[in-house]
Amino acid sequence: KVETGNIPSVVIMNCVAYGNGYIESENGLIDAGNGNGFKMGGSSLPGSHVIINSVAFDNKAKGIDSNSCPDNVVVGCTSFNNENSNVALYTNDAKNTNYRTNGIISYRNAYVKVADNLKARGTQDTAKLYDATDYYWLSASGDAKEASTLLTDANFVTLNTNDVKVTRNANGTINMNGLG
């Protein structure tokens, strides 16, 4: 935070964030917390925080949130059906951003009118933010960077998150058991 300065780079790898912002009770789900999946950064301070091979789905707010950090790195991540942006890379006060992405899949079949929030500033090399392997949800039509490359439900094994059982493989990677 501003009072203490930026922190060293944090690396999140092979992780899953789902259902954040809710607590199960006897009467169903109740609101609790801000509901972000992966929230990386704050106060427009640089940190070069890294998230690799991770999945965010069914969160009350954003799936992957830079939280105003201007230089996050996102590699091989999937974000699906979060109630706010699946992917939000933005800053409030930094003059320049240096986001680096590769292999992002952002997809929805719910909350389809909610686009990803991608805001390059200043000296940002947009090729690093819009890599050819990235699929962002830019509108209700599911636009990718190139309109000829759209994802549909058919691109996924299953999108049923109600029955998914998230486990780990012996090597530590995520086993989504068919989701995605």
Question: What are the residue ranges of the model-derived segments?
Answer:
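Extended hydrophobic-aromatic, low-complexity segments
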Residues: 63-66, 86-89
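Right-handed parallel beta-helix
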Residues: 1-27, 39-40, 46-62, 70-83, ...
